[in-house]
Design a protein with these regions (language model features):
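Basic/polar N-terminal segments that are highly enriched at the extreme N-terminus
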Residues: 1-2, 32
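Active-site nucleotide/adenylate-binding loops and adjacent lid/helix of ATP-dependent enzymes
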Residues: 2-8, 12-13, 19-20, 90, ...
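Conserved N-proximal alpha/beta basic substrate-recognition cap immediately N-terminal to
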Residues: 14-15, 19-23, 31, 37-158
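A short, N-terminal amphipathic alpha-helix
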Residues: 24-35, 204, 208-209
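Residues at the C-termini of beta-strands that transition into short coil/loop
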Residues: 40-42, 129, 157-160, 197, ...
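Glycine-rich phosphate/pyrophosphate-binding beta-alpha loops
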Residues: 105-106, 190, 248-253
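Short small-residue beta-strand/loop micro-motif enriched in glycine and branched aliphatics
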Residues: 126-127, 189-190, 267-270
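Phosphate-binding site of ATP-dependent enzymes
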Residues: 197-276
Length: 276
């Protein structure tokens, strides 16, 4: 059996979404091949080994259980191997893990920080590496790389907390005027994202985004098609791609996946997509 450390929860605003994702991953694991080792991370960033009822993961009730604290110890050499340790009865003991599967969303999970920690500790992990994770989490960096590669994308300007009113107005002009989208530069799941049609909405949008990140992306409003495609593999073992899906958005004009009760209320998912 392969012991898979499933990391879930986390410190970001997408904590609850991570719980839902972890619940899906746990259910999908082949129990004949993989043994899940559940590592829950609370909103304060503390790590715990959870061994209770799996149903309590998605609800968040796992935190009410008596969980053993977990730490990561650096070391990747054969004679100085690092990894996971759990605190049991006042003593640290090794938590046997063959590979880690981070099922974390947002900052502290998808931004390369956890990936870097796992690499320093010599723990193999599933998913993007440090650089790809960091670049994909930062909208400014991803826009710049796309532009450098010749990929067309909306105009994107960056503001930092404390920017002057003149700077705030200037980036709107650089994006072609209203409407614009305002986003935490390193957030996800549309949390803190607003569409601003005028100066009043723009002020509120900036306040909402700056409450979540000191760096904010202001983007040109475009009419396009939103598509998604899962990619599995790497340059060594080859790459497999799934079907391309298409998200058709109605109503307020963008996909609000973070809505808890009905995240798809304003959307229609087509798979495969109906692209020409």
């Amino acid at each position: 059996m392969i012991n898979v450390a499933i990391l879930f929860g986390g410190i970001s605003t997408e904590h609850d979404i991570s719980l839902k994702s972890a619940d899906n991953v746990i259910a999908a694991l082949d129990s004949k091949r993989f043994c899940p080792v559940l590592i829950g991370i609370d909103r304060n960033g503390s790590w715990f080994h959870y061994t209770g009822d799996l149903a309590d993961v998605v609800t968040g009730a796992w935190e009410e259980h008596d969980c053993a604290p977990v730490v990561l110890i650096p070391g990747s050499a054969p004679d100085a191997r690092g990894g996971f340790l759990e605190l049991v009865d006042g003593e640290f003991r090794e938590l046997e893990v063959d590979v880690a599967l981070p099922v974390l969303h947002g900052q502290g999970g998808e931004d390369g920080t956890v990936q870097g920690a796992l690499e320093v500790c010599g723990v193999p992990y599933v998913g993007c590496g440090v650089l790809a994770s960091a670049v994909c989490m930062d909208k400014d960096a991803s826009h710049r790389l796309a532009a450098a590669a010749g990929v067309r994308s909306p105009k994107c300007e960056v503001l930092y907390r404390g920017a002057t009113a003149e700077d705030e107005a200037a980036v709107v002009e650089k994006c072609g005027g209203y409407p614009v989208f305002v986003k935490p530069a390193r957030g996800g799941s549309s949390i803190g994202v607003s569409k601003a049609n005028d100066a009043d909405e723009y002020r509120k949008a900036l306040d909402a985004a700056f409450a979540l990140d000191e760096k904010v992306a202001v983007e040109e409003n475009i009419t396009g098609v939103e598509v998604g495609c899962a990619v599995v593999g790497d340059a060594v073992h080859g790459v497999r791609m799934g079907e391309v899906d298409e998200i058709v958005v109605h109503g307020d004009g963008f996909f609000r996946i973070h809505l808890e009760k009905d995240p798809g209320a304003n959307t229609e998912l087509r798979c495969p997509s109906e692209l020409p």
